[in-house]
Amino acid sequence: MLSSFLMLSIISSLLTICVIFLVRMLYIKYTQNIMSHKIWLLVLVSTLIPLIPFYKISNFTFSKDMMNRNVSDTTSSVSHMLDGQQSSVTKDLAINVNQFETSNITYMILLIWVFGSLLCLFYMIKAFRQIDVIKSSSLESSYLNERLKVCQSKMQFYKKHITISYSSNIDNPMVFGLVKSQIVLPTVVVETMNDKEIEYIILHELSHVKSHDLIFNQLYVVFKMIFWFNPALYISKTMMDNDCEKVCDRNVLKILNRHEHIRYGESILKCSILKSQHINNVAAQYLLGFNSNIKERVKYIALYDSMPKPNRNKRIVAYIVCSISLLIQAPLLSAHVQQDKYETNVSYKKLNQLAPYFKGFDGSFVLYNEREQAYSIYNEPESKQRYSPNSTYKIYLALMAFDQNLLSLNHTEQQWDKHQYPFKEWNQDQNLNSSMKYSVNWYYENLNKHLRQDEVKSYLDLIEYGNEEISGNENYWNESSLKISAIEQVNLLKNMKQHNMHFDNKAIEKVENSMTLKQKDTYKYVGKTGTGIVNHKEANGWFVGYVETKDNTYYFATHLKGEDNANGEKAQQISERILKEMELI
């Protein structure tokens, strides 16, 4: 999750920069004017897009399963004999899935991230100390106060808490303070430039204060401290500073007489030339911002009089286009596209009394009473958490195969290819019944190979199967990218039993019969186990099914998560104890 977020954050912000660059270029071309620098704040928003949860978005996924998992069908395997009427022939068979340990990598990434942020924080503290030095060394002047009043009058901006001073510890004009603003001019500027030139410089700094540019700059500083690894923030910050200076120049030029425009440009150029090479306030400048390309500014000032007035409608359209680009990419780049949690709110009866059955496991149990249309749930948060379906997915893979005529009602046989598998039950010809009873992987892998990926995606979307993510390896259902919650397992069984799916009713009945564990006069007991073995440890156990009585049907799903021994057999044992306690079997 962490690596996905960091990666998607960079991609999202880079895409946003590309869009802004394109829109900005077209805007300049067709309006002969500049856009507001505030458009670059969208880049900050884009870095947070991966944190936004979106439901049922699936086509574009950076799945950790794609990067971290490698399936082995020749490593260790586990066989569990299941309790029940057909225990002599029904086994919970599963093979191991090797996964690289991602926890250490995650911790390492987190450590590097925090270390980088701490370095940025240290640099920020250094900047604040430099600012304190500048403030303490700055001197007030009645002359500058008079110039400030003149400039405020010209700009019609009478902010109460604003002061002006000069300091020999800076080489270019600066503005401090988010609430109480302080303009500080370099001593060399005050000593060298004339009254008009100083007023031009003050007008420019006042424009920064009036536009609240320092606030936007501080936002960028905070984001750069947190997302220091993201090159998009450095690119966009440079562009924002350049545009910010031009916007402030434009604001000043608006209030000056036409014949003063050239003199204003000359003053800006002169102020830049007066910079000292011996003053080091880089840290403070990093915090305060507004570095710019002086050549671009002078060129803009020189061409200002020939530029048409800004078109407000076109500017609004440009902003809307950039904002829409964020909305479009948001669902595509959300780190939650895998949807490891099923987002739903259902009314249910709590089954807290079942806790002893799940001792030693993080587990959940979901029961749906068809007649009463009511859910009963143990551990509701866990029942919404999605996990690999493992062999429980074979139910729906079989239905897809029937729909694509890979299987028929009269012919479900597949010949064994003589490959030696870990279980003797797998080393023989199979049909639907035997493959379901013994969870024969190769049988369903063969079916899956004959299904196009887009077909599988369509089926999963049609029946609303979990996160619908099949971007992992070829066994995407076996501790890979495809995930589903216990509540969704129950809903799927209900829809299948009620024939509310696209599939043929007779095909559904054929699959149901292959899952039947017990048939009595008073009830029919149907179920399927699933076991996820990760690095030779049973970490994920499923048992899903239903009990059909004469006047009702009860759908259930039990899931177990643990360090080891969380398997389908254990899930079935717990399920049957619960169902017996409820007097359903």
UniProtKB/Swiss-Prot annotation:
GO molecular function, one term: penicillin binding
Keywords: Antibiotic resistance
CDD domains to which the protein is assigned, alphabetical: M56_BlaR1_MecR1_like
Biological process, per Gene Ontology: response to antibiotic
Record flagged with keyword Nucleus: no
Stretches for region Beta-lactamase-like: 351-585
Family to which this protein belongs: Belongs to the peptidase M56 family.
Its biological purpose: Penicillin-interactive protein and potential antirepressor.
PANTHER family reported in the protein's UniProt record: POSSIBLE SENSOR-TRANSDUCER PROTEIN BLAR, SLR0241 PROTEIN
Protein name, entry field: Methicillin resistance mecR1 protein
Organism listed in the record: Staphylococcus aureus (strain N315)
